[in-house]
């Protein structure tokens, strides 16, 4: 009696051998590094939150104070992203198309939120926008309180997310051919028509990408917001600060669940950003 053994073609064996032969030390180091720095912390958070069960997770994630912090965090971050979508586009346009004294200094200042420690940024913003600060004193007579309110949270999120839209747009603006604009003008188009029909369409993907990047950065902001906000529940308390407060109270399950919610939102945003970038590349190729 004969037994037919499974046959593996030489080409498949060669492909497997070639794969293992192609693995190099940099590849191994990269995988280990990413596992330790990115994958394991995320996996630990997800496993910890999953251990509570669906019902326990839902009860903690939907408490009134948690829902209030989601509202403050996500809506304020979205508002900051939309404002920077407009003003960041204007800043990028000026830096690319206009020549003026001190342009390099202004361009370098755009990256200040990247370099400045967030706690220092929060301290500076709270000092400027308090009712006795250089800026806040002009709004105080009208009953407008910026620092230690939700408006202060908005200002901090605008500050830390501005570079994302500017730096995303600048390369696209630099690659736009001015000949297309000149052709539109020669055909009788106004400046507004030229901008709306020739310049603006290629800018839509990077603008949306910049807004998404700024939004995701603002959602996770802690250092600058905690100093300019009053951090009062149901007023201007944001989700990252609530996570820290729960850790201070040794309420690790609540901190884990709220952190998992923020992580889920961040992963969804990363997916959206990747889709927007692919759309932008296809649009540029077309």
Swiss-Prot record:
A Pfam match: BPD_transp_1
Location (main, coarse): membrane
Positions of disulphide bridges: none
GO molecular function: ABC-type sulfate transporter activity
Membrane topology, from the record: Multi-pass membrane protein
Compartments where found: Cell inner membrane
CDD domains found in the cross-reference section: TM_PBP2
Domain ABC transmembrane type-1: 70-273
GO cellular component, one term: plasma membrane
TM ranges: 27-47, 74-94, 108-128, 146-166, 195-215, 224-244, 257-276
Induction: By sulfur deprivation.
Keywords: Cell inner membrane, Cell membrane, Membrane, Stress response, Sulfate transport, Transmembrane, Transmembrane helix, Transport
Subunit structure of this chain's protein: The complex is composed of two ATP-binding proteins (CysA), two transmembrane proteins (CysT and CysW) and a solute-binding protein (CysP).
General function of this protein: Part of the ABC transporter complex CysAWTP (TC 3.A.1.6.1) involved in sulfate/thiosulfate import. Probably responsible for the translocation of the substrate across the membrane.
Family the UniProt entry places it in: Belongs to the binding-protein-dependent transport system permease family. CysTW subfamily.
Protein name as catalogued: Sulfate transport system permease protein CysT
Organism for this UniProt entry: Synechocystis sp. (strain ATCC 27184 / PCC 6803 / Kazusa)
């Amino acid at each position: 009696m004969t037994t037919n053994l499974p046959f593996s073609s030489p080409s498949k064996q060669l492909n497997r051998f070639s794969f293992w032969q192609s693995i190099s030390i940099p590849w191994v180091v990269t995988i280990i590094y990413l596992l330790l720095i990115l994958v394991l912390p995320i996996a630990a958070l997800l496993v910890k939150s999953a251990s509570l069960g669906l019902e326990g997770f839902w009860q903690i994630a939907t408490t009134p104070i948690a829902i209030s912090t989601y509202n403050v965090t996500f809506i304020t971050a979205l508002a900051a992203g939309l404002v920077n979508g407009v003003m960041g586009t204007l800043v990028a346009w000026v830096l690319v198309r206009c020549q003026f004294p001190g342009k390099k200094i202004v361009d370098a200042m755009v990256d200040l939120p990247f370099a400045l420690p967030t706690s220092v940024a929060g301290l500076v913003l709270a000092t400027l926008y308090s009712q006795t600060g250089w800026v806040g004193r002009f709004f105080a007579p009208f009953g407008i309180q910026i620092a230690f309110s939700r408006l202060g949270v908005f200002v901090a999120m605008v500050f830390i997310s501005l570079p994302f839209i500017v730096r995303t747009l600048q390369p696209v603006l630099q690659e736009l051919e001015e000949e297309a604009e000149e052709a539109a003008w020669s055909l009788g188009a106004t400046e507004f028509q030229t901008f709306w029909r020739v310049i603006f369409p290629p800018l839509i993907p990077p603008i949306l990408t910049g807004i998404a990047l700024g939004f995701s950065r603002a959602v996770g902001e802690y250092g600058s917001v905690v100093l300019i906000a009053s951090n009062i529940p149901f007023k201007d308390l944001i989700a990252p600060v609530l996570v820290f407060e729960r850790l201070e109270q040794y309420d690790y399950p609540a901190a884990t669940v709220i952190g998992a919610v923020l992580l889920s939102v961040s992963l969804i945003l990363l997916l959206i950003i990747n889709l927007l970038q692919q759309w932008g590349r296809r649009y540029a190729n077309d």
